[in-house]
Structures are given as C-alpha cells and as structure tokens.
Amino acid sequence: MSHSDQSQRFLFDDTDVRGEMVDLERSYSEVLAKHPYPEPVAQLLGEMLAAASLLCGTLKFDGLLVLQARSSGAVPLLMVECSSDRQVRGLARYSAESIGADAGMQELMPEGVLTLTVDPVKGQRYQGIVALEGVNLAECLSNYFASSEQLPTRFWLNANGRRARGLLLQQLPADRLKDPEAREASWQHLTTLADTLTAEELLALDNETVLHRLYHEETVRLFEPQPLVFHCSCSRERSANALVSLGQADCERLLEEEEGSISIDCQFCNQRYLFDASDVAQLFAGAGSQGPSETRH
C-alpha cells in the first residue's frame, strides 16, 4: 500500500456530490520534526494539515489557504497553510505542563475560534470565522459549512503522529438531480455511509479500499492523485524585508541589544537568518539583502 503524500478527488456519477481524500506522512513528519509536540497536539495538528489540504483541493485558485485556531487553553494557537501548489506547513504553540495524555480538542482549546482564510494572488481575500465547537475538528468544520452560505460539506479526519488522513464530501450545485428532495436524500445517503467509517479504518486503508468499503454499490469515478509536500516559504529576502519595515533606527537598536547581530527565526521550520551591522547598512542603503550564509538551530 502506497503512503506517498497525496490528495485524490472522486465524483459520484449519478448525483451531485464530489469527494476528496488526503494522505499525509512525510510532510506531516517534517512538520512534527521541527518541534517536540506532545501527542495530543501532534494529532490535532495533523488533522488540521489534512483539513487544509482537503479544502485546498476543492478550490480553483492561485494562492494560499490558511486555517488558524486560537484559544485561551493549553494550545493558544494552531496554524496550517496549504498553497494552490499543494505545499503545506504548520505549527502549534502550547503549554506542555497542562496537557493530558488523552486530551481532545475541547480540552486543548477551550473557547476557541477557528479562522479560514483564502488569500488568492489575484482577487479578493476571503475570511470566515467560527467558534471551535464540536467533539472534534471534523465536526467543527462540518458545522461551519452547514451554518454558512457555502456548499454543504462534511469532513472525516484522523491523525496519530505518524500519518494524517482526511475524507471530504461536498454537495455540488444541482445538475444531475434537480429535485430538492432527491438531492437531499442522496446527500444524506452518502454521508451516512461515510459515518460508518471508523477512525482506525481511515488511517489504515488506502483510498480505493475506503471507497469500495463505503460505496461499492455506487458509481464512483476516482481521479489521479496529486502530490502534497512540506515546504516553508520563509526566506532571507522576506526576513530582510521585515527588518526594513521596522526602520533603520530600530534595527540599529536591535544590533546593540543583540551584540552586533540580529537573528530572525522562522516559527514554522526553525530556520534562522542572521544579519550583522554590514547587512543592516546594506538594507537601508538599497544594496540588497545578501549577507552571511543561513544557519539552523
């Protein structure tokens, strides 16, 4: 069974419903390798990576999709990005001493808020906000789509610190089925079947097996899988631009406080970018941002 990181789309030929499945191993492992997350945090972060990848697969755009959850609990921040090029990255901030071994989403992130942002290269930025309610992230996202003016969409998510998996079903505008009652009956039928899939099966089975297990009596068209990879968009140039935005006076003050070298660390991948006095002088002289080579923690 192949576990290569991928998203795979499928359609039901006899009704107006499409689906997407996501499988993340290597990219999920690379995200977790950057920080020593407790197991419950790693699991929730994996579910968010799968969810963002699923959502990105339903959109036709050139840009970035961001899922961000904030709370007043042990995990004040979870943030995941997926680009239209199917590149993912993610991070979490947490207080380890207050996290139980079996803590769920509501224990980790009480009174939380989930923000979905679609930021296209061209066009208008979209943002939706919903309370982080429900037993788990899949229920929260499903409730968000049910309560907003979006296409009805359901999610099934699971992660175990090694593999993150997701299944999405989305009802499309009326085409094959025009009758509202027939559309609703078809939607309820397909989602009810998906509800019989256990979390263990979602993690253990490949896409074709999952679809056969659920929909062997339906006509399902499975498309070619699309690769997903971990990629961090940080760069020395972006770090230099951040310093320029601070202004020369603040940068010179930082140089004094940091004993002659400013370091900027990427919170996603732990890459560190160093700028000495000569680099800072070049930035504000308009001579570019080239300087010492990058080093890691």
Swiss-Prot record:
Database matches in InterPro entries: Heat_shock_Hsp33, Heat_shock_Hsp33_C, Heat_shock_Hsp33_N, Hsp33_helix_hairpin_bin_dom_sf
PTM info: Under oxidizing conditions two disulfide bonds are formed involving the reactive cysteines. Under reducing conditions zinc is bound to the reactive cysteines and the protein is inactive.
Broad class of the protein's primary localization: cytoplasm
Disulphide bridges: 232-234, 266-269
GO cellular component: cytoplasm
Domain of life, per lineage: Bacteria
GO molecular function, one term: protein folding chaperone
Any one GO biological process: protein refolding
Alphabetical keyword list: Chaperone, Cytoplasm, Disulfide bond, Redox-active center, Stress response, Zinc
Location(s), subcellular: Cytoplasm
Gene3D superfamilies, sorted: helix hairpin bin, Hsp33 domain, HSP33 redox switch-like
Role summary: Redox regulated molecular chaperone. Protects both thermally unfolding and oxidatively damaged proteins from irreversible aggregation. Plays an important role in the bacterial defense system toward oxidative stress.
Stated family: Belongs to the HSP33 family.
NCBIfam families: PRK00114.1 (NF001033)
Protein's name according to its UniProt entry: 33 kDa chaperonin
Gene coding for it: hslO
